[in-house]
Amino acid sequence: MGKDVIVACDFASREATLNFLDKFTGRKPFVKIGMELYYAEGPAIVKEIKARGHKIFLDLKLHDIPNTVKKAMSVLSRLDVDITNLHAAGTKNMMRAALEGLTREDGTRPLLIAVTQLTSTDQESMENDLMIHAPIDEVVMHYAACAEEAGLDGIVCSPLEAGKVHEKCGKHFLTITPGVRFADGDVGDQKRVMTPAAAKAIGSDYIVVGRPITAASDPVAAYERCVAEFCD
């Protein structure tokens, strides 16, 4: 059984985001706040959505020198989000520094997740653009092992890799998987995709779903369909 469906609120403004969330009068979705919304509205939007009772995945994908990431994570830890992330390509030293910065004085912290390869990346673009010639699944497994060794809680990966990650790193190591679409839906710019039911079957812990819910004619019904396929 999947742990939860995370709704990617990729809106450009506070007004659009809150208008969308106002539709959900029952179960409050776990919300992903990405770069567009965070850069437009700042920490205030995180605090406001949190105050409404939503869990939050703050998806900023930090990637910089270790000390800079450590200081940034120390600031993010004050926002009381539930999950945040960084790029595994930043090295184990950066990931360890991030954990140190994210951990509060009382020892608590949000879950910290590493991004491996974006679901918009395929083998051809990885080789031609990034000059990484290993098979994409091997790269994901390598990044997963590095993240686990650094002490992180899991990774963001394609649902196609979730089962293999659990085999390598254990069931405790979380997999958060975007690239999820309904069987009758448009895949958009995602190149490695799977349905909610298939992601559940293969062992994804969380799925991140954006446009199939946010752009649906009935977002609440689309969300409930996702929950039914993945969580129930």
Residue ranges and their predicted role:
Residues G2, T68-A72, S77-D153, E161, ...:
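Conserved anion-binding
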Residues K3-C9, V31-I33, I56-L60, T84-L86, ...:
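Hydrophobic faces of well-ordered beta-strands that scaffold small-molecule active sites
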Residues A12-F24, N67-V75, I136-C146, K191-A198:
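Short, acidic/polar
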Residues G26, R52, L79, A150, ...:
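Structural motif
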Residues P43, C157-I207:
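A C-terminal functional module that forms or caps the active site or interfaces directly
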Residues L79-T91, F182, D189-A222:
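Glycine-rich phosphate-binding active-site loops on the catalytic face of alpha/beta enzymes
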Residues M95-G101, E105, K200, I213-D232:
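C-terminal helical cap(s) of enzyme catalytic domains, especially alpha/beta-barrels
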